[in-house]
Amino acid sequence: MEIENVLLAEAAVADIRGAMTLVGYNQRVVNSPNLPFSFKQTLIITLRGEAEAGSHAQLSVNLNSPEGDSAFAFAQQVPIPPPASKDVPSFINIAMDIPFSGNSYGTYSLKVTWREMGQESQGRDIDIFVLDPAAATPAAG
């Protein structure tokens, strides 16, 4: 299976078909008037492709601060479901709330890694920008 999308949102809801509704999609700029700060984001990972039904893969999520320190780390085995039909590839939608807290302003890096047994790992990175609204200057335009 391959990572198709890695998204951030304020919230996500899935229906019985697996379709997802996202609220506040692409919340990558955070204005925090105080330090330390804390809030939650919903991480959505969409995987697609062929895989051996009944097997497992390793999902890892790491959030690093602007200084390179680990602010959050998570790893879990994920079961791979069988495809809905022999003519349809497998799809997996994973939505999880992740805590987001820090002690500094700057660019935080969120890395998602997916690894199936016998396969090379693959990853996606998302930058999240934490700004002090008092220090922000409007862009020239």
Predicted features along the sequence, with ranges:
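Contiguous segments within soluble domain cores/interaction surfaces
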Residues: 3-141
